[in-house]
Structures are given as C-alpha cells and as structure tokens.
Regions:
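N-terminal cationic amphipathic segment used for targeting or macromolecule association
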Residues: 4-7, 21, 49, 53, ...
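C-terminal edge-of-domain segments
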Residues: 51-71
Length: 71
C-alpha cells in the first residue's frame, strides 16, 4: 500500500463516498508512473479534505492506494 495527496473538486463532499472515490481514483491514476496501474483506492483521510489556498475550488486528501505493474 502506498500514500499520496490528491486534489479533487471542492463541490464533491466527504459524504458523497462513491463520487469521491471515483475522483480520487482518477487523480491517483494521473500521478502514477507509466509502468504502474491503479488497483484500487483503499482509503482516504477526510480530515485532509480542506480547501487549498493555492488551488481554489479544490480539496486535498491523503489517499492510500494499491498498484500493480502494467503488462
């Protein structure tokens, strides 16, 4: 399992679990090196979901995820 930080649209609240998971999966996938693919987002820290000063309209989350090598 690995950890990263991800920014998602501020209009996605911590209570919209499926929508939030999809947004986190998209963001984490963009951050991965070309030789890795995302298996799943395991968990995220909702307390990290505050507005970010240098990214207006975004919330920052700490995300735990699993990857595997691309074929």
């Amino acid at each position: 399992m690995e950890l990263t930080e991800a920014l998602v649209a501020e209009d996605i609240t911590p209570f919209e679990r499926e929508r939030l998971r999809e947004a986190l999966e998209e963001e984490v996938s963009r951050q991965l090196p070309a030789d890795r693919q995302l298996l799943r987002v395991v968990d995220w820290d909702p307390r990290g979901g505050h507005a970010v000063e240098d990214a207006p309209g975004k919330r920052k989350y700490t995300v735990a995820y699993e990857t595997e090598p691309r074929d």
